[in-house]
Amino acid sequence: PDDYVEPMPKKQFQRICKSFKSQGGIIQMSDATDEYLSSKHAEAITYDSKTILLKQNPSRASVFEEFIHTHQYKTGENDGSYESRLKCEIAAQKKLIKYSKAYKLTDKEITQTQRALEAYENELKEYYKNGGA
């Protein structure tokens, strides 16, 4: 399909997951998780500083973005509010773009990230335009 993005190499993924799990993190990946994420129109979801839902064979961008989100929860950047969630999404997209070379993101992932950044920035503008409610 046209929206196909290359999965993160297995060795790299296993190394990152091992480190996260050694700090008490939980990564949920299964057919059921894929179905749930599909119903939410999401590639991945971070619930808190320790819990990530990832679709099977995730892209590098998905994996790194979710780890950025766990850190945002850990540092209190994300308080769960709509506004805070949008600000965290924007910060995560910017970080992915800034470190795209280090993360070895593909051109397609960078383009998708730039699109997502624009969408989140527009959503936040709308939120403020409507009085922040």
Predicted regions and their residues:
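Catalytic toxin/effector domains delivered as secreted proteins or via bacterial secretion systems
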Residues: P1-A133
